[in-house]
UniProtKB/Swiss-Prot annotation:
It is found in: Cytoplasm. The record marks 29, 250 as: Transition state stabilizer. This is Acetylglutamate kinase. Its EC number is 2.7.2.8. GO terms for molecular function: acetylglutamate kinase activity; ATP binding. Belongs to the acetylglutamate kinase family. ArgB subfamily. Keywords: Amino-acid biosynthesis, Arginine biosynthesis, ATP-binding, Cytoplasm, Kinase, Nucleotide-binding, Transferase. InterPro entries: AceGlu_kinase-like_sf, AcgluKinase_fam, ArgB, Asp/Glu/Uridylate_kinase, Glu/AcGlu_kinase, NAGK-C. Catalyzes the ATP-dependent phosphorylation of N-acetyl-L-glutamate. Pfam families: AA_kinase. It catalyses: N-acetyl-L-glutamate + ATP = N-acetyl-L-glutamyl 5-phosphate + ADP. Substrate binds at residues 64-65, 86, 190. It is an enzyme of class 2 (transferase).
């Protein structure tokens, strides 16, 4: 009997959040181990479909780094990286677009639909969804001066066509976006998926930006989870090197989205089943909540 009461209490705990977020938009960056483990893929799909059934508009932006690496290796193309950014020449961009748009995007859409969703796959070229420009990478030269170098078809989002996303949402569809942007001349750009998610969330004035990662969330120097943090506190933790490495661009992406109007950002562990529901509909959550 107790386990039944516990289930009822869990449902009651979720009730105020369901009421608060119905009709709002969540932008979720889907990536990491959650995209490769079959059990986690099913869990994520069910979480997203649950959000939609509760009246929450979920917009998915997915990554695909491992799949890109595997395909480039198969084609014998060696990648060069500058400060973590893939140098993307024309040949590499063709492979990136093929993998993200033609393979990964369709896999995510198919999985959501298989589990009862109405997902529609998009990339930045569809309806000029992600109008983009070339991103120049800053590096420090031998003389200590900051230089900007061209790393090919790597871009940043200039404008998001929210009309297309809103039209799909109103029809009950789940937009699934591949992080490939389009330039003014129709050229394709490879864009960091976290950045795309942040820009889309800001353009939609989203309630939440949620990044699925392969860590529990933002950790302190003792490797303990920080459950709640403000942007100001986050910058201090970067300065004292509590936050380092690959987590820095993720928290910076969240900070930019918050400054541009997103209400809250969350960095959560995508390796945990139903991580999205546990973060949103429980009082404690399972990851890090970032506020302005």
């Amino acid at each position: 009997m107790k386990h039944l009461i516990d289930k009822a209490n869990t449902l009651m705990e979720a009730l105020p959040y369901i009421r608060r977020f119905s009709g709002r938009t969540f932008v979720i960056k889907y990536g990491g181990h959650a995209m490769s483990d079959e059990r986690l893929k099913e869990s994520f799909a069910l979480d997203v479909i649950m959000l939609k059934s509760l009246g929450i508009n979920a917009v998915i932006v997915h990554g695909g780094g491992p799949q890109i690496n595997e395909t480039l290796k198969r084609y014998g193309i060696v990648s060069e990286f500058v400060r973590g950014m893939r140098v993307t020449d024309g040949e590499t961009m063709s492979v990136v677009e093929m993998v993200l748009v033609g393979q990964v995007n369709k896999e995510v859409v198919g999985y959501l639909n298989q589990h009862g969703g109405k997902a529609v796959g998009l990339c930045g070229k569809d309806g000029s969804l992600l109008l983009s420009k070339k991103l120049l990478q800053e590096v420090t030269g031998e003389d200590g001066a900051i230089e900007q170098i061209d790393i090919g078809y790597v871009g940043d989002v200039v404008k998001v066509n929210t009309d297309l996303i809103k039209t799909l949402e109103q029809g009950g569809y789940l937009p699934v976006i591949a992080p490939v942007g389009v330039g003014l001349a129709g050229e394709s750009y490879n864009i960091n998926a976290d950045v795309v998610a942040g820009r889309v969330a800001a353009a939609l004035n989203a309630e939440k930006l949620i990044l699925l990662t392969d860590t529990p969330g933002v950790l302190d120097k003792d490797k303990q989870l920080i459950q709640k943090i403000s942007v100001a506190q986050m910058h201090r933790l970067i300065e004292d090197e509590s936050i380092t490495g690959g987590m820095i661009p993720k928290v910076v992406c969240c900070a930019e989205a918050l400054n541009d109007g997103v209400k809250k950002a969350h960095i959560i562990d995508g390796r945990m089943e139903h991580s999205v529901l546990l973060e949103i509909f429980t009082d404690v959550g399972i990851g890090t909540e970032i506020t302005k």
